[in-house]
Design a protein with these regions (language model features):
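A structural signal for multi-pass alpha-helical bundles of membrane permease subunits
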Residues: 8-292
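Short, Lys/Arg-rich, polar N-terminal cytosolic tail immediately upstream
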Residues: 1-7
């Protein structure tokens, strides 16, 4: 007769089975199909030619393609700069909202609003703001002659949209620190920097790390805000990896090479996800050690 623990274990797998099957259908099968396509010269256009296996040729071409490498460098720049600024602004705003002042709750709601907006709405709003004819910041748009400025405009929209996520996670961590600790530190003559280093930073480092890794993954695969605002232009200056894969697959109809680009990008995202899991497990171990 099965023990109670084994019965519960089996029942848990039975309950999880529908979700696991759905995940396989929605994730594993398309991923396997994309992997297969990446080894072929499949074209979406009706050329009438049979599909041939080219094996690693698509990957070798991708690694030597200057346009792909430029898109990767552009994506890396977008990710690093955007996430760094979002982290800095998010922490500063969280520290502000953790203070006691009149209207704090109203300000908290206003801070969350950009994050609550759908990305498409946010992108369209910034596109209208940068319109050269009637945009509220058209003076800035007139300076977008240098192509690099367009990427910075997209980064501004992305930062405004996503820094509230960092603020929320850091603010939740700050509220777990008892006010008595800060009061006692002030009585002992500790400076604001020493209080931050001794109490604030240890409390927020875990949630901040998780927020930054999640934002890094999201920023690395940015697509929608670029599609709405710039369509990868001008002169491909805002063409990131996701947009590059989109164009290769659906604009140029090169399904085989597009799949190879997509698999390489998925591998890069997998590395970031592994980093997130590593930080999550390390934070959990620290919590267990602190409780012990």
């Amino acid at each position: 007769m099965l023990s109670l623990q084994r019965r519960e274990h089996r029942q848990a797998w039975v309950l999880l089975a529908p979700m696991l099957i759905a995940m396989f259908i929605l994730t594993a099968w398309p991923l396997a199909r994309t992997l297969w396509l990446s080894f072929t010269d499949t074209a979406l256009a009706g050329s009438g030619e049979a599909t041939h296996y080219v094996w690693l040729d698509n990957y070798l071409y991708a690694l030597t393609d200057p346009d792909f490498r430029a898109a990767f460098a552009r994506t890396l720049y977008f990710t690093v700069v955007s996430v760094a600024i979002e982290g800095a602004i998010g922490v500063l705003v969280a520290l502000l909202l953790n203070q006691r002042f009149v209207g704090r709750n109203v300000l908290r709601v206003l801070v969350i609003l950009p994050w609550a907006l759908p990305t498409i709405v946010n992108a369209m709003m910034w596109r209208l703001n940068f319109n050269p004819d009637y945009g509220s910041v058209n003076a800035l748009l007139s300076q977008l002659g240098p192509p690099d400025s367009a990427l910075h405009a997209v980064m501004l929209a992305d930062i405004w949209k996503n820094y509230p996520l960092v603020t929320l996670l850091v603010l939740a961590a700050l509220q777990s620190v008892p006010d008595d600790l800060y009061g006692a530190a002030r009585l002992d003559g500790a400076s604001a920097w020493r209080r931050f280093r001794a109490f604030t930073f240890p409390a927020i480092v875990g949630p901040l790390g998780v927020a930054l890794v999640l934002r890094t993954i999201d920023a690395f695969k940015v697509f929608d805000i670029i599609y709405v605002m710039t369509r990868g232009g001008p002169l491909d200056s805002t063409k990131t990896l996701s947009f590059f894969v989109y164009q290769e697959s659906f604009s140029y109809l090169h399904a085989g090479s597009g799949a190879a680009y997509a698999m390489l990008m998925s591998l890069m995202c997998a590395v970031l996800i592994a980093l997130y899991l590593f930080l999550l497990l390390r934070q959990r171990r620290r919590s267990i050690d602190d409780e012990a």
